[in-house]
């Protein structure tokens, strides 16, 4: 079972994917976490690309990102959750090739939505050191634009569920579980 979560920064993707991972006992992979881990481990290609792209609110090159993700996916088989991948048309093309090559399909895509006001509140509370709010806003603008083709593709497949991410963690989780159960 492959489940994908997409949404803007601070929409609760990490919280909800981790809860669902525990509930279903399947691993979750976050592009952001994989990139931050490689950055902390001083992976030269990632460090340079992160400075060039992410600090300006832009996506890292797809082949660089997907190489990190593919290493993890190849270890787990056909049951996993993805946090914010695919996030662009380019991501989607590479991911579709991966799915085809491995005979896999996506079960459900959960799109978490929040307002800019809520995003700012969560940003202030979370206070991640590597971000400032203007970069986060720019990242959201770019990601919202890039995500359109991804959302349309999964909507056309009939596997997209849009969930309001502004409720309590429990309320959002309940709605996600309801969406997943209605897919059966």
Predicted regions and their residues:
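Glycine-rich phosphate-binding loop of ATP-dependent small-molecule kinases
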Residues: 1-184
């Amino acid at each position: 079972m492959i489940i994908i979560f997409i949404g803007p920064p601070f929409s609760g993707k990490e919280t909800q994917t981790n809860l669902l991972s525990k509930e279903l006992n399947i691993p979750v992979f976050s592009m952001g976490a994989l990139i931050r881990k490689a950055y902390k481990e001083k992976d030269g290609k990632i460090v340079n690309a992160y400075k060039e792209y992410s600090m300006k609110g832009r996506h890292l090159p797809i082949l660089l990102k997907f190489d990190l993700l593919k290493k993890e996916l190849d270890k787990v088989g056909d049951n996993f959750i993805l946090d914010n991948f695919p996030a662009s048309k380019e991501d989607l093309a590479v991911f579709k090739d991966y799915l085809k090559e491995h005979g896999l399909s996506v079960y459900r895509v959960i799109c978490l939505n929040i307002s800019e006001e809520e995003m700012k509140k969560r940003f202030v509370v979370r206070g991640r050191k590597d971000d400032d709010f203007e970069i986060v806003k720019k990242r959201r603008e770019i990601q919202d634009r890039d995500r359109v083709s991804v959302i349309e593709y999964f909507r056309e497949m009939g596997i997209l569920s849009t969930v309001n991410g502004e409720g309590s963690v429990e309320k959002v989780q309940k709605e996600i579980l309801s969406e997943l159960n209605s897919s059966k």
